[in-house]
A protein has these predicted regions:
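Interhelical loop and adjacent transmembrane-helix boundary motif
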Residues: 1-4, 34, 47-58, 204-230
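Short hydrophobic faces within alpha-helices
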Residues: 60, 85, 103, 164-172
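Transmembrane-helix boundary motif in ABC transporter permease subunits
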Residues: 2-3, 68-101, 121-122, 163, ...
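Transmembrane alpha-helices
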Residues: 10, 15-22, 137, 144, ...
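Membrane-interfacial helix termini and adjacent extracytoplasmic/periplasmic loops
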Residues: 35-40, 44-45, 49, 93, ...
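N-terminal, non-cleaved signal-anchor transmembrane helix
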Residues: 1-54, 58-61, 65
């Protein structure tokens, strides 16, 4: 019989600490009673009422749409930034560029949201766009910080690649774009998928940035839930 050592015990405690509250939340979502401390039996009336709330259902669809757009654009921009940082060792402004790519990772979301709000207001006054804040401005705001996560993930993968494989393909006559599409992309595909899923989750979970750059009729799910709880 396998002994319970300290590592196994701490692993189980950590997993329970993370997942037990989620399990309790799911179970109590079927509670017929309005009180959390009183169990009134199993019921799905809260889920039926949720589907009847058209405003909440609309915010779910809107959040999923924004998250999908954010994941796609973040993977694209983050991958390009990662290639620049890993494949071009020296160029003027490299330190500044690297700092700008990773800045959203450490910058408070309140500062980022306020800065983007001021930017959108100034752009509307100068060039007339955006005329109003909505899904597009939320998408831009989410992409601005999700791209940093993708860049970090993809950069780590690119640094581990064996460049001799790409060099061998080019020695055999393959064009750089063909090497990129047929060799590099398949090798970094797991990191692209991880970055895309991370961007999707971050966009779906964001409340602060969306609160700054959203407008009438563009309420996301976190904003709707926060408003209901408050």
């Amino acid at each position: 019989m396998k002994r319970w050592n300290f590592s196994n015990v701490m692993l189980i405690v950590g997993l329970l600490f993370i997942y037990l509250p989620m399990l309790i939340l799911v179970i109590y979502s079927f509670n017929a009673s309005k009180l959390v401390t009183v169990w009134g039996g199993w019921s799905v009336k809260w889920y039926v009422g949720l589907l009847d709330n058209t405003q909440l259902v609309s915010s779910v669809g809107r959040s999923l749409e924004i998250a999908f757009y954010t994941a796609f654009s973040s993977v694209l921009l983050g991958t390009l930034a990662a290639f620049v940082l890993t494949r071009i060792p020296r160029f003027r402004g490299r330190t500044l560029f690297g700092g700008m790519v990773t800045a959203p990772l450490v910058m408070p979301e309140v500062i980022t949201g306020l800065s983007l709000l001021l930017l959108f207001v100034a752009m509307a006054q100068l060039i007339g766009w955006p005329q109003e804040r909505g899904i597009v401005t939320i998408w831009i705001a989410h992409t601005s910080f999700c791209s940093s996560y993708v860049a970090v993930v993809v950069s780590a993968r690119l640094r581990e690649l064996d460049l001799s494989i790409e060099e061998a393909a080019m020695d055999l006559g393959a064009k750089p774009w063909k090497v990129f599409l047929l060799i590099t992309i398949p090798m970094i595909a797991p990191s692209l998928a991880a970055g895309g899923m991370m961007s999707f989750a971050l966009s779906l979970d964001d409340l602060v940035l969306a609160s700054f750059v959203s407008g009438p009729g563009s309420t996301t799910l976190p904003m709707e839930v926060f408003s209901a709880v408050r």
